[in-house]
Amino acid sequence: GHALAKGFALYDLGAYPGMVPGDGVVRGEVYEIPEGLLRELDWVEGAPFLFRRELIEVVLEDHTPLRAHAYLYNREVEGAALVPSGEWKV
């Protein structure tokens, strides 16, 4: 389902977004997956080099708090445009 991550900012890195710690709210989606898929997702996301996986607090649409894995951008965002809405549109 959909969720909000408070205390983060989303940047437009061109072909993809990058979430970093910040003063905003990032809107995204939460999926339940088998634990064994995390290594595969790490590879897809370029972790731990391009992105790093961290457990963060999110709030679901029904206001339920949840700890979820998120991929935070692991490089500088200087020069990248902030996505003010906090939501990446594909």
Each language-model region and where it sits:
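Glycine-aromatic micro-motifs
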Residues: 1-90
